[in-house]
Amino acid sequence: EDMLQNGTVISETMIEKPHSFFTACNVTTQIVAQVASNQYGGQSFTLSHLAPFVDVSRQKLRKSVIEERIESGEVLDDAIIDKITERRLRTEVQSGIQTIQYQLITLMTCNGQAPFVTVFMYLDEVPEGRTRDDLAMIIEEVMKQRMQGVKNEKGVWITPAFPKLIYVLDEDNITEDSKYWYLTELAAKCTAKRMVPDYISAKIMKELKNGDVYPCMGCRSFLTVEDSQRNADGSHKFY
């Protein structure tokens, strides 16, 4: 999150804060590749760190749509502008997630392996409202693309080994009348076809981990909570 929000340096090159969701996805894969080439074992990142960049792209696309309609003499109807913007945004989210999936399985680290990566999908990591809805859009696209799979050298659709997926079950997606139930249904279909994602119960994990919910390291251990490591808002630091 810090590297995406505040920029970072990769191979002596300054990487500034991304100005679109697609760029954020590209930067994420570069960070994963660099980390994987300098350590053993797996690594995890959460889609909630990408969620804020959906609205960055939304505002950028909306501005572009307005400019196009002014140039072509079209009426500036907010409903039409919003509809076009959301359609283009969906396309960008689709492209961004596809970039993550294909770059991670085709990248080779310095030891000749694809990065061992786990993607964490937990809606309650972001505030309720538009950001959570944007995160839901990202999660939905990840599930759909994983259900489709990737083509092998013979052109046959197969299940990629990485990234591994973890989906968290909580009050807003666990019952049929909950807002994000459709994601849980999609996750179940994805599991039936591709054997991912794995599932974490937020309720049980909070009981076992002092109220925290977080991913395992790659596909292995869960960190023991270190009380001295805190985020700016006082919550425990896991990323």
Protein language model features and the residues they cover:
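Conserved catalytic cores of very large enzyme subunits
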Residues: 1-239
